[in-house]
Amino acid sequence: MAAKDVKFDTDARDRMLRGVNILADAVKVTLGPKGRNVVIDKSFGAPRITKDGVSVAKEIELSDKFENMGAQMVKEVASRTNDEAGDGTTTATVLAQAIIKEGLKAVAAGMNPMDLKRGIDLATAKVVESIKAASRPVNDQHEVAQVGTISANGEAQIGRFIADAMQKVGNEGVITVEENKGLETEVEVVEGMQFDRGYLSPYFVTNADKMTAELEDVFILLHEKKLSSLQPMVPLLESVIQAQRPLLIVAEDVEGEALATLVVNKLRGGLKIAAVKAPGFGDRRKAMLQDIAILTGGQVISEDLGMKLENVTIDMLGRAKKVSINKDNTTIVDGAGEKAEIEARVSQIRTQIEETTSDYDREKLQERVAKLAGGVAVIRVGGMTEVEVKERKDRVDDALNATRAAVQEGIVVGGGVALIQAGKVLDGLTGENPDQNAGITIVRRALEAPLRQIAQNAGVDGSVVAGKVRESDDKAFGFNAQTEEYGDMFKFGVIDPAKVVRTALEDAASVASLLITTEAMIADKPEPKSAPAGGMGGMGGMDGMM
């Protein structure tokens, strides 16, 4: 086991604070509409330029192990806030730095760290209650756009795109962000259910210009196993031909003779038909086939349930107004399923979302809900260069997370004002002893830090701005750093999701309390550098041999 280096008391806390300051100072320059960029070197490719706090934090590793521990703890604040709320990472980092700085000063002055922690926890709980009480629901698409704009560092176009996407697919809908190959940023909305399986043969294409197979007023056969022969389903195919309607086959696979027969029938014009593989794998495939069955009002033909292809009748097939298939995706629009059954399926999946502990499973279940309940929107982010596209994509991701958080828990006044206004509940709050009171005061002071930093990044004196906002009785009064004017922040459109503000404070206070109560730090001692290997000696007598 390697030898350890142990630091105690002031020495440990000073080194830790240096690490906290290095990370927080790099992150906080990005805060607010006039926040600056941070350039991150990459081991390959162009450097990355970003205004995303968590992206900056994740890149920082310090050579001094004790300083690095402090930096990593604050990195944890940014990561946790990002995981919970998806935005607010820079605010959380600024709050954590402010609480840690003041807290360590108090410890150095001889105060009890545990009582300081109790005071900080007490104050944080009160402020969180006040933030929740102050929040109000998002009323319209315009407010959704404002939240997105603020989170995207003031780019109104991004806010509008997100509001547009959310209106089209609903709050439950899936919105994904991708890089666009062109210059423009655009939103594409896929109505109905889309899954990532394309046609099994290009011969199924009906629109040669777009290379898509488009079937209208279509029957849908859902089969759990592979189809290698069409013999068992001849009676069903005859019924479909008599009905003069197209047929889509969704199965684990359609291969060999079965696929060849379908293609020949299609080319001869006898049967409008297309075949795709079922989405997903294993149990997830079964669940997704069942989703499609409920959406289209059909049944999954499953041997587990004792069903055989030869016994399938036309009323067991699903139906949809339109199916569009390209080489990568299949989209089912306007399925004939009962609304009540679809809603029951959605609530069943929501229960699974609440119970699952896996982030991956949760994401996949949420996608299934969206496909059943709303639809899917894709925001494709464009730009002049790869570096610009990546930087904008970071901001679109942040803005999207912020708008989702706003829909969940409502909005509060933005620009750091909500924290200062919520902090007024601490004016009459006292702890059980002077050290707890000091903890409450630390939080009260720290709540001003985000507004001070926003003003500072805009080139204005943060102390003057914070003083003016604190003295105002109007809860919406604040400083708009974009235009450098004071007034009603709701009218300016400067609003924040309550969830983001709350989460930032809770996570910052939690990690800051841990650092303040730290008394010793342990790290591996650096390995002594071994001496270089010896050379080949003087070779002194060689001259005489020349």
Swiss-Prot record:
It comes from Cereibacter sphaeroides (strain ATCC 17025 / ATH 2.4.3) (Rhodobacter sphaeroides). SUPFAM superfamilies: GroEL apical domain-like, GroEL equatorial domain-like, GroEL-intermediate domain like. Keywords: ATP-binding, Chaperone, Cytoplasm, Isomerase, Nucleotide-binding. Its main location: cytoplasm. InterPro entries: Chaperonin_Cpn60_CS, Cpn60/GroEL, Cpn60/GroEL/TCP-1, GroEL-like_apical_dom_sf, GROEL-like_equatorial_sf, TCP-1-like_intermed_sf. One of its GO terms (biological process) is protein refolding. One of its GO terms (molecular function) is ATP-dependent protein folding chaperone. Gene3D superfamilies: GroEL (3.50.7.10), GroEL-like equatorial domain (1.10.560.10), TCP-1-like chaperonin intermediate domain (3.30.260.10). It is an enzyme of class 5 (isomerase). This is Chaperonin GroEL. It catalyses: ATP + H2O + a folded polypeptide = ADP + phosphate + an unfolded polypeptide. Residues 526-546 are annotated as: Disordered. GO terms for cellular component: cytoplasm. Together with its co-chaperonin GroES, plays an essential role in assisting protein folding. The GroEL-GroES system forms a nano-cage that allows encapsulation of the non-native substrate proteins and provides a physical environment optimized to promote and accelerate protein folding. Its EC number is 5.6.1.7. Residues 534-546 have a biased composition (Gly residues). Belongs to the chaperonin (HSP60) family. It is found in: Cytoplasm. ATP binds at residues 30-33, 51, 87-91, 415, 496. Forms a cylinder of 14 subunits composed of two heptameric rings stacked back-to-back. Interacts with the co-chaperonin GroES.
